[in-house]
Design a protein with these regions (language model features):
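A residue-level signal for conserved active-site and pocket-lining positions in enzyme catalytic cores
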Residues: 29, 151, 283
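Short glycine-enriched loops at secondary-structure junctions
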Residues: 30-35, 197, 243-247
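Short, glycine/acidic-enriched loop or turn micro-motifs at the edges of active sites
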Residues: 120, 157, 246
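A short SAM/SAH-binding and catalytic strip from SAM-dependent methyltransferases
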Residues: 139-141, 146-169, 215-223, 227, ...
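Long, Lys/Arg- and hydrophobic-enriched amphipathic alpha-helices
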Residues: 200-364
Length: 364
């Protein structure tokens, strides 16, 4: 029933506006307060629709934890240090970060932890797994403590709604979501359409104007990076971004995943995870305009290897039986193998220009 209610709400918006932006459609599907995907589902894990690196192996979070400690040390071990995670999922990554660094008492004492999470069900999970820690939860990224800060964004930006534009017949048009049979009030089938835009967006001026090519823009990426840039410029620190994406924005990358399988993004509203490949070039352009240092993209496998994942693998294997070792090997391969997440997922760092180079991302 909830699924059909969401379909009706989307349909009403389409009829009222004669088609809606793709970003509006995605936002309704994903974060509608009553019927959205993140509002009512627990999507992450083997029983969910997708799985993230922290759920695959504890090694991922442990190494990120050591990376954060290095940033803290590089800022002369401040007595107050803000650790922020955007879209913390089940809370596994933050739990592993805090567990693996618990012996560094001075670091733990300095921490002011903030989790940015829009999903009530995921907040509930996070509060259970992180019940022993003092943490502030926010639905929006704002009013962070004005102290040195590290921001972690693992598979966050791919979930932000996107807009699509196409250069057709020498003019820009926007991709919208419409009703398949607009003449029928009973139609609940959606389709993509095109709409003239009166004035091209500023971002479109940077594109190459290739005929019939789709370009993607994420308003949420721009908004997030502008806020983080202002914060890091004022307070020092760094941001670590890990996501699947590419260095440009040419072609449609919208995808829908349900039960670990790809599905039609215009079906199963509120039941499927809608994402897109992250445009790292857009992130870099936005951050460099704010006078921040942005690292080159590094494959996840290379990044984790530089932090010592193989050594950590060996240390953990010593206390495992054969069955657990086999699973451990499989997890390692999934994280770093070039045919799996090792190459598909990219890592980018952003830092204050007066902060030290970032471990695993910049040549010293």
């Amino acid at each position: 029933m909830k699924k059909f209610k969401l379909v009706e709400l989307i349909k009403e918006a389409i009829i009222k506006k004669k088609g809606i932006k793709l970003s509006e459609y995605m936002k309704m599907c994903m974060t509608h307060p009553d019927y959205g995907y993140y509002t009512k589902k627990k999507p992450i894990g083997f029983k969910g629709d997708f799985i993230t690196s922290p759920e695959i192996s504890q090694m991922f979070g442990e190494l990120i934890g050591l990376w954060v400690v290095k940033v803290w040390m590089d800022h002369n071990k401040p007595s107050e240090f803000s650790l922020v995670e955007l879209g913390p999922g089940n809370g596994t990554l933050m739990a592993d970060i805090l567990r693996s660094t618990r012996k560094i008492a001075e670091f733990h004492k300095s921490l002011k932890i903030t989790l940015i999470e829009i999903s009530p069900s995921l907040q509930e999970l996070q509060k259970k797994i992180l019940k022993n820690y003092s943490i502030t939860w926010k639905k929006k990224l704002n009013n962070l403590p004005n102290i040195p800060t590290t921001i972690i964004a693992n598979e966050f930006f791919d979930a932000l709604p996107i807009e699509q534009y196409i250069f057709k017949k020498s003019k820009w048009m926007e991709v919208i979501v419409s009703l398949k049979n607009s003449n029928s009030k009973e139609s609940n089938e959606f389709c993509f359409g095109l709409k003239n835009i009166p004035k091209p967006l500023e971002e479109l001026s940077t594109f190459t104007n290739e005929e019939n090519k789709i370009y993607e823009i994420s308003p949420g990426i721009k908004e997030t990076i502008i806020y983080l840039s202002k914060h890091l410029n004022k307070n020092f620190g760094a941001c670590l971004i890990i996501d699947y994406g590419k260095e440009d924005n040419l072609g449609s990358t919208l995808q829908s995943v349900r039960n670990h399988k790809y599905s039609n993004p215009l079906e199963n509203q509120g039941e499927s995870d809608l994402t897109s490949l992250v445009n790292f070039k857009a992130i870099k352009n936005c951050a460099t305009k704010s006078n921040l240092v942005v690292t080159d993209l590094v494959d996840q496998g290379d990044f984790l290897s530089s932090l010592g994942i193989q050594e950590r693998f060996v240390a953990l294997s010593k206390n495992m039986d054969k069955e657990k070792v086999a699973l451990h090997i499989s997890s390692l391969k999934r994280l770093i193998d070039k045919n799996q997440m090792g190459k598909l997922f990219k890592v980018m760092g952003i830092r204050n220009k007066n902060s030290l180079p970032l471990e695993g991302l910049e040549n010293k």
